Amino acid sequence: MADVGFEWPDWALDMLIGISPNEVMQVLTKQRRWPRRGRGTAGMEMLTIWGRTAAGRPLIVGLRQAEPWQWQIVAARTMSPEQVTEFEKWEQENQ
């Protein structure tokens, strides 16, 4: 099985507000994460990864596939209260 790689476009790093690149990588590399289809604000289709940082902070990371085993990190944000509720339900159902 091939290793999955992640890359950051420069513009995506510039758009991180209140979230460190390290926190994003924690979510992407944790064993428990919830992949879901999503859309960016401009309508771009992406894969979203819902997960927690090592400190337990719930984040959503947006990815766009660049190559078969390579993904670009194009977005990251904190979950809304409603999303946290949905994510916690998923966590309980998928222990």
Language model region names:
Residues M1-Q95:
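Ribonuclease/tRNase effector modules and their secretory precursors
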